[in-house]
Amino acid sequence: RYDGTMPRALFKHIKDLRWEKMNKNHRERYRHVHDWYVENLLTRYVLMPSGEVTIQRRGNPSGQISTTMDNNMINFWLQAFEFAYLNKGKDVEALWKEYDTIVYGDDRLSTTPCLPDDYVPRVVQMYKEVFGMWVKP
């Protein structure tokens, strides 16, 4: 699971990509609302059960209307990056055609035409070094 450590830039990229698919009239009319909403997702105050208030600047908060769809799109984007990263020097475009995945939020079930023997340590290290993310090994 990665949603708590997801970089702001990636989350914002997906939110912007989704916004660009909106009807142009609505996009222009409600841009200020969208910008306010996204900014409050990117930097949010969270009340903890202990009564403490924390500021969170990473991740995608659960419970908002588009958490699952955002995580679906982020998950697919990350898988494409991961696939290209782990298969440098190979015909990634041809291999990607044989890749398949089922995504639900930050969970996934994938088939791949090639998987390195050291996949787990390499992918955990990639997420840490490239994105500053923690993923469960």
Where are the model-predicted features located?
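Core nucleotidyl-transferase/polymerase catalytic module
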Residues: R1-P137
